[in-house]
Amino acid sequence: MGHPEYSVLMSVYAKERPEWLRESVRSMLVQTVPPSEFVLVEDGPLTDGLYGAIEDFESERPGLFKIVSYPENKGLGHALREGVSACTKPVIARMDSDDLARPDRMKV
């Protein structure tokens, strides 16, 4: 039996630390059951460091990331509502950009 496909949903805004974002995203990319899609909501303009981290991940995993961008910060609630709408898989794994997931978090 195959594993169900799932989306990772994460929001990021300008006050986040790029190194935390990198660690958080990586912790989901190395899951025993890897994500089928990664929806990242840019809640307002970001720092160069955050944009750089996101660009690196898009280069490393072409086609995995779906970026939803807003020109101004609208808050976590709005970002997540819009992010859920952008997810296309039957299961959504919610992550904050400063969370770390155990490698077996998505184990079925």
Predicted regions: what they are:
Residues M1-V108:
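Nucleotide-sugar donor-binding/catalytic module of glycosyltransferases
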